[in-house]
């Protein structure tokens, strides 16, 4: 089958933002204007087409990023052919940053939505940081221009100040709040208005109102200057006072946006149907096609040192990244993939190069909001869901078995909070095991383990809301009723002293014995190293090369058990520098045990300390309650970092230990009569004070 849309007309984009910037409403409008959903869904009435899990509709927030395929030819049909958009809607709640992170990983560009009133909020910073990490070109869309206190240019200034990027507006707002009427298009230098009759489908262009002409001229020259900086040739033309054509300006702005040098900004009101078609036009004009960005990097499964790459081309070997696993009541497991290269037809065999397992693709579907279309093949640049994958987890690579590659992996954060779950009845016991397994496969930031001493099932995640929603899904989707214990903090441990320790494991009693012997130098790891930093300094073959990995494994396994109170050890540098072996009795197992015994001795010799997770907390509160909120944060051992005034109230930034924040949602509401809101995300681990160490050690017995 031939390709229906050339890859140059693909746009794989995400719509990202923080809670309540109006992101899902914007996605809804995108679907409406691109003709895929003829009834607009509103988040207010719980009918939005991308929010398809029941909890999302109830809570009015988006949890799973649905991938939707849509087509667009331009707001005034200015393009000869249609462009194919694959749009990924992402959650903005900080407990789901992992969802945002993995969506950004497979996107080529993003539309970052800000609220015209509240501007840059705590979560916008998180999302912006993630987009920087993956080098995603983006456009800023300032939404909710019809809201009281909305001000486009103020938000632009805030982005510059708080996010360190200077946005280049390609539009200005005409009016604001109740009087918001439309935009000034700085490219064509016209005013653009919208009709309620066609729900803001087709822009109506008129001359710029006289009172805004001067402002428009000023920002037009700002835009032209940004374009001129794209090349020496344009700069010379600009300096010589020659006019740049709109085509030259567009091409230059596109080039600089894709290179990540500038961020273009547009405005509108999705809810009032004023402006989304122009956002779609900007996506076509300024965001990259899969062929405009560098080839994806990867490594050879047999030799991680050997780097490889795949270009966005149908003729290259097939490679794709699984970026989301969803359980569907009708077809079972859906594996959402982004195809980077090659072609895959249904029925083909592929290999999961991370696990080295073969998989056969059953059916393939593309999602259009909440309808599905079955397709026969996927090609480079496509995003689709595969049905029939047996053992694929988020972040793994599917590729051609003859030409395997492991695409750059995603990093998933370690969970910071745990609770015990117990099934209510015997029947629930087995169902709960299956349900938790499926949920963990979908969400790598959610972990399940069994406590060996108590036999309890412990689930861990990124925050209270994260675990609440997972337990809720277990009840709804898998009919499992469970009792939930009190949240527990996931502490960590580290050593503070340098020491040299001998690990020796000898068992020789007739026949084949065991002999492992090593000397290890332990120290706190170098800055920025979170896990084990393992160094081999053995010379002269006193410990044969083949036993070195076993020593590393022995240390890693023992690190899980800690040295103070049984919590995992982090930031450890271990240098194996000496030892001995026995020709007959030495084997990998013996060296693993020897290394494990050496690591155990850190409890006496390593000066271990307990670390507690510290959260970055931002509370937005009306001024009347500020004293109470700050006093309360201080009582929770919080460190206030600063405050600022915003339209929505005072913003207090603080760092607070997670252990003191349980139940904060209820407390902050009652303190402020329901008017304050807060967000928090994991920041770092800090040394825990002595009273916490005492309580924790006592509890661990």
Swiss-Prot record:
The keyword Iron does not apply. Keywords: Cytoplasm, Elongation factor, GTP-binding, Nucleotide-binding, Protein biosynthesis. The keyword Cytoplasm applies. PROSITE patterns: G_TR_1, G_TR_2. GTP binds at residues 17-24, 89-93, 143-146. Residues 8-291 form the tr-type G domain. GO terms for biological process: ribosome disassembly. CDD domains: EF-G, EFG_III, EFG_mtEFG1_IV, EFG_mtEFG_C, EFG_mtEFG_II. Gene3D superfamilies: 3.30.230.10, 3.30.70.240, Elongation Factor G (Translational Gtpase), domain 3, P-loop containing nucleotide triphosphate hydrolases, Translation factors. GO terms for molecular function: GTP binding; GTPase activity; guanosine tetraphosphate binding; translation elongation factor activity. It is found in: Cytoplasm. GO terms for cellular component: cytoplasm. Catalyzes the GTP-dependent ribosomal translocation step during translation elongation. During this step, the ribosome changes from the pre-translocational (PRE) to the post-translocational (POST) state as the newly formed A-site-bound peptidyl-tRNA and P-site-bound deacylated tRNA move to the P and E sites, respectively. Catalyzes the coordinated movement of the two tRNA molecules, the mRNA and conformational changes in the ribosome. PANTHER family: RIBOSOME-RELEASING FACTOR 2, MITOCHONDRIAL (PTHR43261:SF1), TRANSLATION ELONGATION FACTOR G-RELATED (PTHR43261). Belongs to the TRAFAC class translation factor GTPase superfamily. Classic translation factor GTPase family. EF-G/EF-2 subfamily. This is Elongation factor G. The gene is fusA.
